[in-house]
């Protein structure tokens, strides 16, 4: 899957079957995705969120997917009463909050709303819970590793945070100058180890 990354031209991230399967299995267990679920899917499938996170977990669990061409607030509002899960970017949730029809009644059948691909403002998290009674589950990942961290499905989901490392995934923050592991309060380079980590960039071994 191609990713723009942070510098230069797009790079092809080489993902193995093991990378994809291990992450999907972990997420299905962590988020308790089963064949009884119905996912509202309005994300692009040329991106890791829509393709690897949303589709792979649903296919592995045997869940139903309500696949939409693009995000349309009216279509989502219509689908919510018969769905149990939604994965989206923060703007999906702010747009839903702008609709008076979005309330506890329309989300009564939902069990989890998941957010990623961009930071979710704490204000949005709080407003969403106030309106619906649901606390959005925010997680963090990248094309090269799939998902790395997640707020808990059961337990306290802290607004403005992306939770803890996934099971079987090791994460540490290191100094870009020395490579030494930094204290929790310091900013540094994220280093990840696990079956979810990709094989490298296509034809770019450097």
Question: Which residues are covered by each model-predicted region?
Answer:
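Gly/Ser/Thr-rich phosphate-binding loop
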Residues: 83-88, 97-157, 170
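Conserved AMP-binding A3 loop
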Residues: 1-22
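Short Gly/Pro-enriched turn/cap motifs at secondary-structure boundaries
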Residues: 160-166, 181
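Conserved S/T- and glycine-rich ATP-binding loop of Class I adenylate-forming
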Residues: 3-6, 39, 45, 86, ...
